[in-house]
């Protein structure tokens, strides 16, 4: 079926209207796979709930990789002033839908030279990276293009790595009037030290080369015999 069988904006709008937080991508994967089939691609959902597509039969293997999960929280889907708003419009259902239509528009000559694999990966926004880990040993492309928001006016050649840290401090419980710092205070001091280290490393560095830190969660569990404090941060 020709590329005109689906309207790109309406197709993306439909994908945005299907909630797909990490771990719950099956419905949107099925929607995207069905759309790929309508566009004449081989569309399917794999064992990791990735939305998959394939076109061409050439020797040069190309992977167009995006992700279809989102962070939690809904943004009302709306088309306003020529812009489409919704959770995942930019990160990253929008880029993946653009890749789908690009693949569907390949010429017959290109299809003879290339085999293009589309992967709308699951759990990219989660530490598990389930979808990418599933396809990594199964696809060996000559070229890979990643669909992530990075500005439309250029091509991003690399991304920084990310370290997720869960820190936990546990110690014997004592009265609040005691002079010794409690578990929560010690954990706060630890994060303050991390900040100081990062800021010292960042002096004179361009943004890409800086160590960026974010405190994502901090919890103090009710004290009984032991004090327990936990925090999650990333670098």
Which residue ranges define each predicted feature?
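Acidic/His- and Gly-rich active-site-bordering loop/insert found
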Residues: 1-89, 111, 169
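Predominant activation on well-ordered alpha-helical scaffold segments within soluble catalytic domains
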Residues: 13, 33, 97-104, 133-136, ...
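Buried hydrophobic positions in well-ordered alpha/beta secondary-structure cores of metabolic enzymes
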Residues: 19, 36, 53, 64-67, ...
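Short beta-strand/turn micro-motifs at beta-sheet edges
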Residues: 74-75, 153-157, 219-225
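Short, conserved micro-motifs enriched in small and acidic residues
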Residues: 85-97, 181-184
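Acidic/histidine-rich catalytic neighborhood of metal-dependent amide-processing enzymes
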Residues: 97-164
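Hydrophobic/proline-rich hinge and linker segments of small-molecule sensing/allosteric domains
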Residues: 162-175
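Acidic-enriched catalytic cores of C-N bond-cleaving enzymes acting on peptides and small amides
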Residues: 176-232
